[in-house]
Amino acid sequence: MTFTEQLAAAWQRNDSLLCVGLDPDPHKLPLSLTGAGGAIFSFCREIVDATADLVCAFKPQIAYFHSQRAEDQLEQLIHYIHDAHPGIPVILDAKRGDIGSTAEHYALEAFERYKADAVTVSPYMGFDSMQPYLAYPERGVIVLCRTSNPGGSDVQFLQVDGKPLYQLVAEAARERWNTTGQMGLVVGATFPNEIARVRQIVGDMPLLIPGIGAQGGDIEATVKAGRTADGTGMMINSSRAILYASREKDFAAAARNVALQTRETINRYRHG
């Protein structure tokens, strides 16, 4: 199955638009795992097992693994998700952006080394920097558009021909880049008006939406702005609020409770 097919199936099977971000901060791991060998993998595995029936995707953030020399644990984690919870797509949050020859190796890293189902990329260097990822027809390519951080406005709101740059990215994705139907866009929950504008531009293209939970994005406004006609179309990401719901031995159960509450809150507004 392609990434988009897996995602659509997960939306329906788990009745969920929730994506759980896997950002394992060694300073916030449960006390029972502190200092243990393979602690990052063990922590993420417990979170995955506790939430897999509640999500439409998992999103490991590559920097949290690389900074701890835990690339092997990231490989192990993605393999584990695919083996233990087949049908749940894994988005490698790498935000890569470089010239074509280097991008070829980043694509190899994401799709052949880590076996991710999708990867996040930056459009700043243009379409040729994204082509190596699109050469993998079964994988997803999720392009930064209107990010959730306040500083994103420094560039994304620059006016070009009377339009903010983020809108031009959305238009390019719809009109020129997404020829194989593999693309999605990143649009932050902290900017619901922009979510609605991007949805208007790109139709049913999937949106990865960070920024709820610890970043303060409003779930009701996010869902109403970004949902498609059938009440899907989004991967609404929450990381810290779920991962670090507890530092005690009940951390996985606590994470599940927060994930369940978040999914149910999202679902309250999907069709209303």
Curated annotation (Swiss-Prot):
PROSITE patterns with a match to the protein in the record: OMPDECASE
What SUPFAM superfamilies does UniProt report for this protein, alphabetically? Ribulose-phoshate binding barrel (SSF51366)
Gene Ontology BP term (one): 'de novo' UMP biosynthetic process
**Which GO MF term does the entry hold, naming one?**
orotidine-5'-phosphate decarboxylase activity
In terms of Pfam families, this protein maps to:
OMPdecase
Q: Where are the transmembrane segments?
A: none
Gene3D superfamilies assigned to the protein according to its UniProt record, in alphabetical order: Aldolase class I
Tell me which EC number(s) this protein carries.
Answer: 4.1.1.23
What UniProt keywords are attached to this protein's entry?
Decarboxylase, Lyase, Pyrimidine biosynthesis
* Domain of life of the native organism: Bacteria
Q: Does the keyword Ion transport apply?
A: no
Cystine pairs annotated here are: none
The positions flagged as active site in the entry are: 95
The similarity annotation says: Belongs to the OMP decarboxylase family. Type 2 subfamily.
Its name, as the record gives it, is Orotidine 5'-phosphate decarboxylase
Gene source species: Cupriavidus taiwanensis (strain DSM 17343 / BCRC 17206 / CCUG 44338 / CIP 107171 / LMG 19424 / R1)
